[in-house]
Structures are given as structure tokens and as C-alpha cells.
């Protein structure tokens, strides 16, 4: 619990004070938040992604942990499951079974007691041995988990939640608002980043988000995690920044700086010095693409 709590009760209280300051629907309506003191609530999150492995194979990796944990990834991310993507059954059957167990596990942590039933809703019996003996007992003394985040790249979020609106759609592409990929109304296009963009006025409430997912023929078990909320479903910062806009923003900035031969500061001076090399690399890339 020392690792999951961020090292101290004060770290937990500080995190929850920040969360309370947002005054959002998730905080106000989460049953675990309303029934447990902040120094006993561990904010939990989980992350998923298809990780590249040997010889081009991919592995679906899901891990979980505390949002307030401090330390390196090896110590703070706890593996939940890993399965080769090629071994997944067609459709959603394999993932459904995995996410049923994840949902069941997180809900047990949020209740703070060893579960009395398995992920299928069947009660444990004497044949289940240790699980039956521990059923209903405190799981972590007086601590409870509190789901606070689902994180991943867009592909995994789409597949894990069965999002009908995604990057593969020609119309609506976002699970949080009604923004579109192509539209005669420029204001509703996803490329409109203005603060007054019309699509910002279409942000879904959590109930609207849940209604969309529940209306589908197949529903992801993850939306039945206690306290599940659209505002706590987020894109992994690695994919948004490092593998996303930085790949465009950084080269663009370097191009502008070297083109104008900016010299202010030692850093810019170094950029000017590598300008010939950058031009050569750009020429090589164009030749390869041709």
C-alpha cells in the first residue's frame, strides 16, 4: 500500500483535493468518493496497448496501478495480462473475457473486500478453497481503490470500449463530442482548434456517452466499472505528444528556424550549424519516397 498510496497519506489527500477542485460530474457522483475518506482512497488507473515484440508480432498488454505512485515504470505499473494479438479470437470474445475479469477485479478493490462471486456472477463455494475462505473479508485493511483513469492510444480505446465513432469513420470520429472528419461546415471539422469552435458546444455528458455505448449490439464490460466516466477516459500522452504532434511540430519549428538562419542563443546557433545536414536528409527522404 505504501507504493500505491504515493508514499504517504498526505500525497493521497493532495491528489484528491486537486480532483475535488475540478468540481466535475465524475467526482461528485463517484460512490467510492462519497463514502470513503480521501486518505483511504487509492486512485487507480489502467492502460492498454498493442506492444511490438519479436519479428513484427504484437502483444496486447494491459497494466494497472495507482495514479499517485511515484517511481519508474517497472515499479509502478502492475501487469494485468498479456496476450499475442494473433491468438485473439475473431470478434470480441477474448477481449470480453479479459475485460470482464478486469472490471470484476477493480470493482472488488473499490468495495475494499474480497469478492464473494466470480466475474461471471457465480458465488464461491467450498470447492474454491482460498477464495471461498476470504470472501467478504477486508481486502486491504481500511484502504479502498477508486477507479480514476482509463488510458491508451486511440486504437486501443476504440477496440476496448467498442467505440462506434472513431478515426476510421468518415463522419463523426470522436467519442467525446460530435466533431467530424469531413464537413462543409468548417467549424465542425476536427482540424478546427479554435477555442470558440462550434464542436466544443457538442461535448457529450456522461449519460449521453453511456447511452451511445449501451445501444450497441455488443457492449464492453469496462463501462460497468464502478464510477466509470467519459471524462476519465484519456489518450496516452506518449501517443498524443511524442508520437503525435511533436513529430510534426518539432521538424516544422526546426525548418522555420534554420530557414531564417536564426542565431539568438546557443541552441539556435547549433540548429543553424546542422542546416546543411537537415537539407540533405530531406532530399534523401524525397528521393526514397519517389
Regions found by a protein language model. Give the residues of each.
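Short glycine-rich loop/turn motifs
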Residues: 41-43, 59-64
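Short, solvent-exposed loop/turn and secondary-structure capping segments
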Residues: 56-58, 186-187
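Compact, glycine/acidic-enriched structural inserts
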Residues: 61-120
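Charged (Asp/Glu and Lys/Arg) segments that form or flank catalytic channels of large polymer-
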Residues: 1-30, 35, 39, 43-46, ...
Amino acid at each position: 500500500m505504501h507504493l500505491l498510496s504515493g508514499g504517504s497519506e498526505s500525497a493521497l489527500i493532495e491528489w484528491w483535493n486537486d480532483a475535488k477542485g475540478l468540481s466535475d460530474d465524475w467526482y461528485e457522483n463517484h460512490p467510492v468518493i462519497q463514502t470513503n475518506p480521501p486518505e483511504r482512497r487509492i486512485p487507480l488507473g489502467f492502460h492498454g496497448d498493442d506492444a511490438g515484440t519479436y519479428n513484427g508480432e504484437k502483444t496486447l498488454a494491459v497494466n494497472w496501478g495507482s495514479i499517485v505512485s511515484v517511481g519508474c515504470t517497472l515499479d509502478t505499473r502492475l501487469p494485468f495480462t498479456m496476450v499475442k494479438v494473433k491468438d485473439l479470437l475473431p470478434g470480441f470474445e477474448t477481449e470480453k473475457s479479459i475485460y470482464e475479469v478486469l472490471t470484476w477485479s477493480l470493482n472488488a478493490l473499490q468495495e475494499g473486500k474480497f469478492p464473494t462471486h466470480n466475474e461471471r456472477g457465480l458465488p464461491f463455494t467450498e470447492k474454491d478453497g482460498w477464495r471461498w475462505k476470504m470472501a467478504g473479508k477486508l481486502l486491504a485493511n481500511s484502504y479502498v481503490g477508486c477507479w480514476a483513469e482509463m488510458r491508451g492510444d486511440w486504437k486501443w480505446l476504440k477496440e476496448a470500449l467498442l467505440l462506434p465513432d472513431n478515426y476510421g469513420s468518415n463522419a463523426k470520429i470522436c467519442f467525446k463530442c460530435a466533431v467530424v472528419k469531413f464537413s462543409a461546415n468548417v467549424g465542425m471539422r476536427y482540424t478546427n482548434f479554435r477555442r470558440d469552435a462550434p464542436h466544443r458546444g457538442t461535448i457529450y455528458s456522461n449519460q449521453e456517452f453511456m447511452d451511445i455505448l449501451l445501444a450497441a449490439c455488443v457492449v464492453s464490460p469496462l463501462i460497468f466499472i464502478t464510477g466509470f466516466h467519459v471524462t476519465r477516459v484519456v489518450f496516452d500522452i506518449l501517443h498524443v505528444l511524442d508520437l503525435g504532434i511533436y513529430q510534426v511540430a518539432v521538424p516544422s519549428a526546426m525548418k522555420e528556424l534554420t530557414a531564417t538562419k536564426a542565431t539568438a542563443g546557443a541552441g539556435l546557433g547549433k540548429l543553424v550549424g546542422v542546416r546543411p545536414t537537415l537539407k540533405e536528409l530531406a532530399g534523401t527522404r524525397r528521393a526514397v519516397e519517389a
